[in-house]
């Protein structure tokens, strides 16, 4: 409803361009058929999971943008962000990198709730902003763009190890039970192709 309201506002006020902030999560699970997600990739999302609402809402938002492009002649661009990090992170953030840093600052070992083999793209927040501005200013109407930097792709266990080493702590693996696991993303490999 929020995205539709913003699109209606943009049409009503003759916006020059509408940017819909999307996410790498729209790609769903990597089934091993690609190394990197390009903007045309369509992965599997199990809609019968606790976390399905977020990636599905982003997919629906993108589809709604395309409808407004066609039906209302609205100029739209879709930057797809990946996991960002930097000085804007909050103590209350529940993302893995935030929790790792929080534990390190508190002088505690870093606890991984998986084997840590998830392989993700990360983007420094200033680079994410630069990518966003580039898409707004230079992107083509109706196109989606991955905001990513291959140099920042890393396995979760390696990221945890870097932070733990810097803090003089250890990485501890505590695999979750099924109830706790239900709240986590099923994606194990989400590396974006940011070349577009």
Range-by-range predicted roles:
Residues 50-54, 82-94, 114-125, 149-152:
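Glycine-rich "substrate-gating" loop/helix at the edge of Rossmann-like oxidoreductase active sites
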Residues 1-8, 12, 16-17, 25-26, ...:
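Catalytic helix-loop patch of NAD(P)-dependent Rossmann-fold dehydrogenases
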Residues 32-37, 91-95, 99, 125-127, ...:
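Short, glycine/charged-enriched secondary-structure capping and boundary segments
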Residues 104-196:
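C-terminal substrate-binding subdomain of Rossmann-fold SDR/epimerase-dehydratase oxidoreductases
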Residues 60, 64, 68, 100, ...:
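Hydrophobic alpha-helix immediately C-terminal to the catalytic Tyr-X-X-X-Lys motif of short-chain
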Residues 7, 66, 98-102, 133:
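Solvent-exposed, non-membrane alpha-helical residues enriched in polar/charged side chains
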């Amino acid at each position: 409803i929020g995205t539709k309201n913003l699109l209606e506002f943009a049409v009503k006020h003759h916006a020059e361009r509408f940017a819909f902030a999307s996410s790498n999560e729209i790609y769903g699970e990597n089934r091993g058929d690609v190394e990197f997600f390009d903007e045309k990739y369509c992965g599997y999302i199990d809609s019968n999971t606790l976390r399905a609402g977020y990636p599905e809402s982003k997919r629906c938002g993108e589809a709604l943008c395309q409808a407004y492009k066609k039906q209302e002649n609205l100029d739209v661009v879709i930057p797809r962000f990946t996991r960002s990090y930097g000085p804007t992170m909050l103590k209350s953030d529940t993302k893995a990198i935030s929790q790792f840093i929080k534990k390190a600052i508190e002088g505690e070992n870093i606890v991984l709730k998986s084997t840590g083999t998830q392989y993700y793209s990360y983007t420094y927040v200033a680079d994410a902003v630069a990518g966003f501005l580039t898409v707004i200013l230079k992107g083509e109407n109706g196109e989606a763009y991955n905001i990513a930097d291959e140099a920042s792709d890393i396995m979760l266990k390696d990221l945890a190890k870097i932070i733990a080493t810097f803090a003089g702590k250890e990485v501890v693996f505590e695999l979750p039970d099924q109830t706790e696991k239900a709240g986590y993303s099923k994606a194990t490999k989400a590396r974006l192709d940011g070349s577009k």
